[in-house]
Amino acid sequence: MDLKERINALNNVGVFLKNNCDKYAQNKDSILDKEIENSIKKAVIENQYFEKDNIMYALRNWGNILNTKNLNLFTNKYPINQKNHNVGIIMAGNIPLVGFHDFVCTFLCGKKSIIKQSKKDKSLSEFIFKFLNSLNEDFHNYIEICGERLKNFDAVIATGNDFSANQFRKYFNKFPNIIRQSRHSVAIIDGNESKDDLKGLSSDIFRHYGLGCRSISKIYLPKGYNLDVLFNSFYEWKNVINNSAYYNNYLYYKTIYLMKGDKFYDNGFSILKESEKIGSPIGTIFFEYYNDKTEINSLLKIKEDKIQCIVSNEIVKNSIVFGSSQTPSIEDFADKEDTMNFLLKLS
């Protein structure tokens, strides 16, 4: 397959996903493609935090990304070559299709993906790979799903938590690699946000139950900010508490805070707690007060190697708008490390 054929195949995936997601958006009881329905049912069983709404949200984003125009604009920025390499990809499983971007980049570069899937997110990507294979019989030359261990690879892209990332570095240190570890995302509020801004922030926090590296786990607030304003905007997401895994985490940390005598604010389904940390437990959102822009920039500088993205109304440079953290573009590389450049520099 040449680049044009690979782009066309991904475009067909995008059209297929978008058509089904449009159906679902119009009527959640719509009958979707049988293969999508089956993969969603399996995914919900695989991961207790996966549910149909969030899965469809992720599929819709990929449906919007995977179109010929986007993919041409994206690939035109790189000197795509046909050097053959096998790229091992170790995927995480915290949110739906979280490792799919690595596959897309590898496929666009004309290299073979040897994928170690997370047991918590297998069915969705397997369905898409099956769909791609139905479009072009040569697709099998570009992907291999491996078992417990990666074999016959020239480079590695691995995503995990801080502990597993350290293990990856030791194991793959002789190979070109991208090793990703835990990162978190933060929001900055100055008190001038609209209701829509705060509604968007709530989505950035609670979508996927706060499990993504782009999920907002910490909010920086101006001193004197009324926390009730935040809690009121959160209310639309009150049903997160109906997920038993989320509820158990929420209750566990609430109990810990009570036993330790920590100060916190509780609305019955989420907790606001003051902390200098940026990575908060599920069900808890950390906050920290700041005095001015100079101080907030200093605070962010200290934590920059642990921050994935920043949401604000242009309070700081390179921040994104409220409500957009869970809809990254194809150019939003995790950890700001250009996967395409990495792949194309392999010798």
Where on the chain are the PLM-derived regions?
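N-terminal Rossmann-like NAD(P)+-binding subdomain of aldehyde/semialdehyde dehydrogenases
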Residues: 1-88, 287-293, 307-315
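Conserved small-residue-rich beta-alpha loop and adjacent elements
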Residues: 73-135, 139
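Donor nucleotide-activated moiety binding/catalytic core segment of transferases
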Residues: 76-94, 146-152, 164, 269-284
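Conserved NAD(P)+-binding/catalytic subdomain of aldehyde/semialdehyde dehydrogenases
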Residues: 86, 136-225, 332-346
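Short hydrophobic beta-strand segments
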Residues: 86-90, 114-116, 154, 219, ...
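Short, acidic/turn-prone active-site loops that include or flank metal/cofactor-
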Residues: 118-121, 181-185, 325-329
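Hydrophobic packing residues within well-ordered alpha-helices of enzyme cores
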Residues: 125-128, 168, 230
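NAD(P)-dependent aldehyde/semialdehyde dehydrogenase
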Residues: 208-216, 220-347
